[in-house]
Amino acid sequence: MEKQIEDRIFKIAFKKLKSSVYYDKTQLILRNDIVRYEQNSKDKIDSKLESLCTQFNDDNKFEKLKELIKRSISISAFPKKLIKSQTPGVIINKQTSQTTVNQNQYFIDMCVEGHILGVVWLMTIGYKLDKLVYEKSYGNRIRKKLINELSDEPTFSPYLFEPYFMQYESWRDTALDEAKKYLHQKNDVMILTMDLKRYFYSVDVTQNAFDKMLEDAGIDKSDKAKCGLVKLN
């Protein structure tokens, strides 16, 4: 029999989703969707999350939920970079008839239920994959205290990821400290930085590669008695 996910996991996931969006200034659309998700319901939010959990655990209801989420998915594009004016150094208050966008920033537009399931995935599967990531990789790392070490269950803390600014400072300071160490040894040092531009728009993870990651993390998709999370993948 497939192991089911308890409704409290969905409640924790929603709390973490709200916290993550609150601190992310780029997620204005999702922030507004969450407000509507809480307001446009006759039931209390706990009852709504319990209902979502029931839909997830019931195979027949889950198929309808999956279709609902898939139909809700679209892409929102916002200007990231504009083409610069051809008259550098000249400031005028005349409005141009058209602004040319050089690059867009894309965001997934999806129903709140889909985002909640995404956080449930992070709490039950994603954190195991995160443990396999190179320790000096700092971007979007899952909180080390996301899972209680004693109970092996997600904590009720609202935080999901390590704060990016702290991760960035660690990346920067570690590199500079290493360079100073060699300078004190009278060695020459050169610091190079590289940026993989628009990485998330171009990366293509195949199903085989993803299955290999799950295997490396000790997640057996075929063992439903121990892993009732197959649906999340």
Task: Show where each model-derived region lies.
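Short linear interaction motifs
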Residues: K84-T87, Q95-Q105, Y168-H184
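Short, glycine/acidic-rich hinge or "gate" loops at secondary-structure transitions
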Residues: L132-F165, C227
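Non-catalytic, polymerase-adjacent accessory regions of viral genome-replication enzymes
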Residues: M1-S97, V101
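Conserved pre-motif C helix in the palm subdomain of viral-like polymerases
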Residues: V101-G139, N233
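Short acidic, glycine/Ser/Thr-rich loop/turn "cap" segments at secondary-structure junctions
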Residues: Q98-M110, R141-D152, F156, M194
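Conserved polymerase palm-domain catalytic core
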Residues: L176-N233
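Hydrophobic, well-ordered secondary-structure segments
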Residues: S151-I191
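Short, flexible loop/turn elements at secondary-structure junctions
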Residues: L82, V112-G114, D195-F200
